[in-house]
């Protein structure tokens, strides 16, 4: 059983805050607040924020906020982390208030990705969530969305998230090019088909992409139109093999991607693990040379959906 119930929020560090402010509104975020240091707090629902954009200059993932159900779950997670030899920092009230939670702890995964766990996310139903483009996101018991990260050691990362945090494996993907095989794992802790995905590889940054899910297909399609009209680099629509998302990938002002889509399937606890050799049923073509994954080599098929036509399928983000 998972000790965490979803990713409640993430923090990203950026080098171009004004560009992010315009970009965030284009894809439907409500800017809830601006911190004293310039941090943008982006809203997707009744929570105060789900994404914090910090002007750190690093253009990468800064932290991941894992939600636990209550104080008992919070204490159990602390004990489990310490028993596994993971250093834990218990944050004070001021830090918890800054994150908008009741209690907060900090730790790192095996690759050094800064992680936080909390319970009691601040909810503001008295302050209506108003997207500038009337976008409604799927959140609640499924968390804010999913993240895909690059890690140092695949097996060590798998053990940590499965044995310590208690995530379940939803599916595995093994793809490659030029004789180099890449293993990708997709893990869940709630009905969302995956909250976390990762593969091992060399990269100057950790974050490949994070995913936002809309309530309707039209909301996804209209956001794609706004990106095209606004000159924001994006792929076309496609559908993934594992979570069935109809989605597209956007290049953010920081260079990493956002997957933006609809129709992610929900799974139950006894869902069997699947293995795939491709990432998309159709679509997700790169447009104007835009690559939506750090792992996509030049010899890739034009579309991930065409990977079954080549001898060795090509790694791509899901």
From Swiss-Prot:
Q: Name one GO molecular function term.
A: catechol 2,3-dioxygenase activity
Q: Name one GO biological process term.
A: xenobiotic catabolic process
Keyword Ligase in annotation: no
Which CDD domains would you find in this protein's record?
Answer: BphC1-RGP6_C_like (cd07237), BphC1-RGP6_N_like (cd07252)
Q: Extract the InterPro entries matched here.
A: DiOHbiphenyl_dOase (IPR017626), Glyas_Bleomycin-R_OHBP_Dase (IPR029068), Glyas_Fos-R_dOase_dom (IPR004360), GlyoxalaseI/FosfomycinResist (IPR050383), VOC (IPR037523), Xdiol_ring_cleave_dOase_1/2 (IPR000486)
A Pfam match is BphC_D1
Give the binding site residues for Fe cation. Answer: 146, 209, 259
Cofactor(s) essential for the protein = Fe(2+)
Q: Which residues form the VOC domain?
A: 6-120, 143-263
The record's catalysed reaction(s) read: catechol + O2 = (2Z,4E)-2-hydroxy-6-oxohexa-2,4-dienoate + H(+)
Origin, by domain of life? Answer: Bacteria
Keyword set includes Metal-binding: yes
Keywords per UniProt: Aromatic hydrocarbons catabolism, Dioxygenase, Iron, Metal-binding, Oxidoreductase, Repeat
| Cross-referenced NCBIfam families | 23dbph12diox
Q: Would you identify the family this protein belongs to, as annotated?
A: Belongs to the extradiol ring-cleavage dioxygenase family.
PANTHER family for this protein: GLYOXALASE DOMAIN-CONTAINING PROTEIN 5, GLYOXALASE FAMILY PROTEIN
| Entry protein name | Metapyrocatechase
| Phylogenetic classification of the source organism | Bacteria, Bacillati, Actinomycetota, Actinomycetes, Mycobacteriales
- State the encoding gene: catA
């Amino acid at each position: 059983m998972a000790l965490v119930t979803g990713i409640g929020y993430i923090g990203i560090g950026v080098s171009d805050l004004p560009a992010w402010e315009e970009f965030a509104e284009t894809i439907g975020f409500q800017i809830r607040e601006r911190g004293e240091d310039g941090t943008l707090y982006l809203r997707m629902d009744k929570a105060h924020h789900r994404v914090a954009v910090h002007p750190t200059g690093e253009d990468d993932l800064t932290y991941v906020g894992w939600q636990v159900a209550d104080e008992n779950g919070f204490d159990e997670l602390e004990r489990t982390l310490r028993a596994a030899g993971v250093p834990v920092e218990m944050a004070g009230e001021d830090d918890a208030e800054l994150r908008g939670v009741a209690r907060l702890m900090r730790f790192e995964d095996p690759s050094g990705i800064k992680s936080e766990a909390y319970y009691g996310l601040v909810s503001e139903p008295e302050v209506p969530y108003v997207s500038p483009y009337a976008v409604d996101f799927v959140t609640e018991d499924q968390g804010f969305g999913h993240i895909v990260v690059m890690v140092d050691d695949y097996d060590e990362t798998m053990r940590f998230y499965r044995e310590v945090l208690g995530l379940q494996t939803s599916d595995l993907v093994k793809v490659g090019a030029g004789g180099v095989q890449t293993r990708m794992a997709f893990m869940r802790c709630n009905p969302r088909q995956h909250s976390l995905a990762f593969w091992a590889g060399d990269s100057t940054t950790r974050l490949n992409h994070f995913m936002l899910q809309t309530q309707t297909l039209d909301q996804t399609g209209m956001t794609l139109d706004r990106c095209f009209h606004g000159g924001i680099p994006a792929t076309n629509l496609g559908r993934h093999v594992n979570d069935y998302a109809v989605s597209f990938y956007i290049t953010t002002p920081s260079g990493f991607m956002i997957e933006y889509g609809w129709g992610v399937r929900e799974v139950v606890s006894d869902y069997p693990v699947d293995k795939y050799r491709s990432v998309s049923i159709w679509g997700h073509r790169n447009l104007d040379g835009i690559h939506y994954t750090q792992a996509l080599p030049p010899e890739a098929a034009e579309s991930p959906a065409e990977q079954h036509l080549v001898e060795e399928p090509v790694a791509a983000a899901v």
